[in-house]
Structures are given as C-alpha cells and as structure tokens.
Amino acid sequence: TEMYSNTGGQASKASNIGEVCQFAAAGKEISKKSLAEICMTYGYIYVAQIALGANMAQAVKAIAEAEAYPGPSIIIGYAPCELHGVKGGMTNCQNEMKKAVEAGYWNLFTFNPALKAEGKNPFTLTSKAGKMDKYQEFLANETRYSRLSRAFPDRAKALFEKNQEAAEARYTHLTKLVDPVSYTHLTL
C-alpha cells in the first residue's frame, strides 16, 4: 500500500514522492525504496512485482512460479486501499491497478534465479513504457496525492514532476536489466 496502512497510514520508506500521509502532511520528498530490487541483489530469491487488475495472466504465472521455486520467494503487488482514496471508492480498485501500470507508476516484472542455471536472464520485464501523458492524471485520481494539490499547489506540482521523473528513471533502469550483460550485477 506504500505506507503503514495497518497502523493508520503513516509514511514509510515505501511511500512515494508527493504522497500525503501521517508524518508527511506536506508530501513526502524522497523516492521510495525498491523492495523488489533489494531482494534481487541477493541473487537467489524469486521476486515478482504484480498487479492483478492490470495483468491477471502475469500475476497468476508469477504466483505459480514463486510457489514452485525451491527457495525464498516474494511477490509485491500493487494493492490500492482505502487510505489511497481512489476516486469512486474501492469498487474501482481493479481499474486503478490497470491505470497504475498503464501510466508507468507501477511496473510488472519477475526475477527467477532458476533461469540462470539454464543460461537465461532471470529478469523478465512485462510492463511496456508508461503513458507519461497519463501519469499526472493517475496521481490526481488518488486523494493521497490530490490533497497536496489543494493545500500546496506549487509544491504539489514540483513533487509530482519529481515523482514522474523517478518513474521514468525506474523504467529505464528496469529495461537495462533485460540485457544479459546488465543483470550480472544482481548476484553477489
């Protein structure tokens, strides 16, 4: 959920730039950590980043691969919650997942270390490049972001641009991992 949602919605290292939550009433200023990439650096953990509402087939395949993998696995899913404040309510949850992926806010991928034994790249990027013209619209659809626009419009504009730039850089980085030469740094 990109925050500590089980204790009331406090900012965490998983909170994104410009997100308004407890302890970040003026919008979080720094990028979120990438738990998926942290896990990939170990080289022996199966890692998947999914969003059921965006790509059910990728999610189901990742879950099956994670279960079959003979070592530790982690699946990180984009899961809107009430604290996100999705416009139209939680009945729009599946559609919000799709919007997150289409805009480039959330990327779908897997890292399957078992593929290395077959001489294959363990990293698979399922997401296409985000439709960056939809990015700000996506942020505005969740009150965890839109609240900042109402309270501090200039700050919101700057932080949301920074958020989008981070998303573009993240996707560029992920595309480099598709190259077999680039992924070698993922193993210790």
Model-derived regions: residue spans:
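Short, amphipathic C-terminal "tail helix"
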Residues: 171-182
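Thiamine diphosphate
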Residues: 1-73, 80-82, 86-100
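Conserved small/polar residues in nucleotide/adenosyl-binding loops
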Residues: 184-188
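A short structural micro-motif
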Residues: 165-169
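Generic preference for well-ordered secondary structure
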Residues: 19, 23, 31, 46-47, ...
